[in-house]
Amino acid sequence: MAASKNSRNSRRFKSALTSAAASVAFCALACFATMACAVWYFYRAGATLYYGDAEAHLNIARRIIDSRTPGWSQIGTTWLPLPHLLMLPFVRHERLWMTGLAGAIPAAIAMSLAAIFLFAAVRRAFGSVTAATAATAVFLLNPNTLYLGAIPMTEAYFFAALFALLYFTVRFDETRGWGALAGAAIAVCAASLTRYEGWFLIPFTAVFLLVRGKGVVRRIAGVLVFCSVASLGPAIWLAHNRFYFGDFLYFFRGPWSAAAIQGKTDYPGRDNWQMAVHYYFEAGKLAIGLPALGLGAGGAVAALYRRAFWPVLLLMLPPLFYVWSIHSSSTPVFVPTLWPNSFYNTRYAMAFLPLVAFGIGAIASFGRIPAVLAVLLAFTPVMLHPEQHSITWQESDVNSRARRQWVGEAADWLKPRMGPNETFLTSFSDLTGIYRELGVPLRNTLTGDNDVEFVMATTNPPVFLHTDWAIVLSGDDLQTLLDRARRNAPKYELVHRVTVKGEPALEIYKREDDVPELPEHDDTLP
């Protein structure tokens, strides 16, 4: 009888394992297919590189391998490096780089993995495929998720790391195993190399592992191992900033940091907790919808009832980080429904979505009818107004019109006039999109990221400045340099100007060297 009972238990275990694997495999197939369709849709709509940040992420990855000074130094200082490193296999292909697909494809893979880890985590937390399906649908089918997962932005990579951390910590809570702990450490390390809110997750996760571990010695050893791996991300970034820029915190207080960009200009929420919460919640309503936010809040209570304390705490951390950033870290969030009635950083409200999705998964764990009703209610705004673009798509469109006009007109003007392998003095900024559209290798551009060569060219132009063209914004430092250089040599003549209302003009200069004529040959000379 005992053998028969053990046999039945073994069969049940194998059956459950097979069922779990099959459900995850089906989820993976659906997620990858969904994101492939999203990439194709936004590419056909021409929206892949609407965000200026998307253009910049793509070109940072490209310049690591295609620059006058290629290598690790081209990663820069403000944005964390992992997304750019993951784009490297794709940006090597010129056509993928020129179209932006080199950044869209890895982002779509990351967003698919995020949804798969969410499915697995919710299934394990509530023991319900229905709950996992509902949570995954609410997350992946959000129009903003589809857009941000189909363009070269960092949100997809962070969501993948966050949900991997969720899965491995939920698994650790059940098994107390070293494999789950190692998975959690790798996941949070990846998060910390993707976005700064990943750093915020490390101490909370360490405390969770310490509290939920088994045995005093095993707990301490586990936390030490976790912290050793998890802290590699911040340690690498601090060392990178110290080595290349002379300051461990250059990313935080350098000229390209959020604090430097915002300066002392006031904005709603700065040093005001109530206003910070108000603006962030308003952005959340636009990005996720009020019904979904309400369901997420109710679902969080349901999750606590189901004793899923840690997942709720973990998924609350990113929204709390952003409210803190609005209040204390020079990070404004503007929405069209509140003063100054514009778009800026609205995508940060997507940090609400993991908690909302998990909460709806908790509601769905009570049965199929609650699951269907919760999912339908969450998507009510989309169903009522299917013609409206997502808030992130709107933001990227509105804020990129000047840049797209600059890039398009400049590229159209240059295409029939530039020769093969001609070189450009320029800045690594929005203007880099011109060279991407034209297929000009970034090694044919000279920018401030080329260190010694750029310094030599700008401090002694007659000797070291040899580019065929210069493309600058009116009034910037390079335009001033060209005016100064005209007094001696080389001379750059303004040949075209692109003007956009309310923006500085883009100016294209062509080098006009005075080449002295050779004397005629004199046969009488010896």
Region spans (language model):
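Perimembrane helix-loop-helix junctions
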Residues: 4, 171-177, 201-234
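Signature aromatic-anchored transmembrane alpha helix within multi-pass, membrane-resident enzymes
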Residues: 25-30, 202, 207, 227-231, ...
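Membrane-lumen/periplasm interface segments of specific transmembrane helices
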Residues: 37-40, 220-298, 320-322
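Multi-pass, polyprenyl lipid-linked donor-dependent membrane glycosyltransferases
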Residues: 52, 83, 102-110, 134-164, ...
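Transmembrane-helix motifs of polytopic, lipid-linked glycan transferases
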Residues: 105-126, 160, 164, 168, ...
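Hydrophobic, aromatic-rich transmembrane alpha-helices
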Residues: 210, 282-322, 356-359, 375
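Membrane-embedded, lumen/periplasm-facing catalytic core of multi-pass transferases
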Residues: 378-431, 521-526
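Short periplasmic/luminal acceptor-recognition loop of GT-C membrane glycosyltransferases, typified by
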Residues: 414-447, 469-473
